[in-house]
């Protein structure tokens, strides 16, 4: 894929940068793998806002993606690469030798016609899925499980990947893009290569309306609110924050560590912020 900078024919297109999608499927998605997706607009069952800045947006179906890749030993041919409105990565439609079709996260460099396979005996080839114990040290991987058989949870977004650093006993060490080094059970599965659509981070939407299409509502700064609405609010005329930056609920907003899961602390070998002050 490549990117293209749009000509400034209007205020909304000035500065807009898009990802060229020439190789993507132009037709409808595979209907048996679609599910209804209801929008909650960030509200809970009481109608209270639980996630701010959500609401509206275009309706779309959920594409059921196979994150487990547990159809071992059966070759699958990539039929096409598709756009998925639910994620930054593209998805690939696989057709297995027995006729079943499944969506997977499309790895970088994958094209229609490529044959993939999963299982312990699979070759070390981009798009193949194997248990980590069967993957050589130094291999770039993505779609990594955290528990055997649960399905991929790590490195699933566009351009994401991790590197297998070492294997010792029942655990392997994997370095994530954030710099964190984490222990993963060697029976967990991972896919060879990195996630495609790596130019996603270079996109510029160009106008506020493009975010509204995505269901993202405006974000209002705390300093322009009233004191009842935000710790930064109030004051006569234009005023600063008058304190350290915080969330509407008083939690420090810049660099404050919020991780609170001591149960899995022993799985982290090196924290992602170990190089920061």
UniProtKB/Swiss-Prot annotation:
- Disordered, as annotated region: 37-60, 223-264
Provide a GO CC annotation, any one: large ribosomal subunit
Start-end of Basic and acidic residues biased regions: 229-244
Q: Where is the composition biased (Polar residues)?
A: 39-49
Question: Which Pfam families does its entry note?
Answer: Ribosomal_L2, Ribosomal_L2_C
In UniProt terms, what function does this protein have?
Answer: One of the primary rRNA binding proteins. Required for association of the 30S and 50S subunits to form the 70S ribosome, for tRNA binding and peptide bond formation. It has been suggested to have peptidyltransferase activity; this is somewhat controversial. Makes several contacts with the 16S rRNA in the 70S ribosome.
- Subunit notes for this chain? Part of the 50S ribosomal subunit. Forms a bridge to the 30S subunit in the 70S ribosome.
Protein name, entry field: Large ribosomal subunit protein uL2
């Amino acid at each position: 894929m490549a990117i293209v900078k749009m000509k400034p024919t209007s205020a909304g297109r000035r500065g807009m940068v898009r990802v060229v999608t020439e190789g993507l499927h132009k037709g409808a998605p595979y209907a048996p793998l679609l599910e209804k997706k209801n929008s909650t607009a960030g509200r809970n069952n009481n109608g209270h806002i639980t996630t701010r800045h959500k609401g509206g947006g275009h309706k779309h179906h959920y594409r059921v993606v196979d994150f487990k890749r547990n159809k071992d030993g059966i070759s699958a041919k990539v039929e096409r690469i598709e756009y998925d409105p639910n994620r930054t990565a593209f998805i690939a439609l696989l057709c297995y030798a027995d006729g079943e079709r499944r969506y997977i996260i499309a790895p970088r460099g994958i094209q229609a016609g490529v044959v993939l396979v999963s299982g312990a005996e699979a070759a070390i080839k981009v798009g193949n899925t194997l248990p980590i114990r069967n993957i050589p040290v130094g291999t770039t991987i993505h779609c990594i499980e955290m528990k055997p058989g649960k399905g991929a949870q790590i490195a699933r977004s566009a351009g994401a990947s991790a590197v297998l650093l070492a294997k010792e006993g029942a655990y392997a060490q994997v370095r994530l893009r954030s710099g964190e080094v984490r222990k993963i059970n060697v029976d967990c599965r991972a896919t060879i290569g990195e996630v495609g659509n790596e130019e996603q981070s270079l996109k510029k939407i160009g106008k506020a309306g493009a975010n509204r299409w995505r269901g993202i509502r405006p974000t209002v700064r705390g300093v322009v609110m009233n004191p009842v609405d935000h710790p930064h609010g109030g004051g006569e005329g234009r005023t600063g924050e008058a304190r350290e930056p915080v969330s509407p609920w008083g939690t420090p907003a810049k660099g404050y560590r919020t991780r609170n899961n001591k149960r899995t602390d022993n799985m982290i070998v090196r924290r992602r912020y170990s190089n920061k002050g």
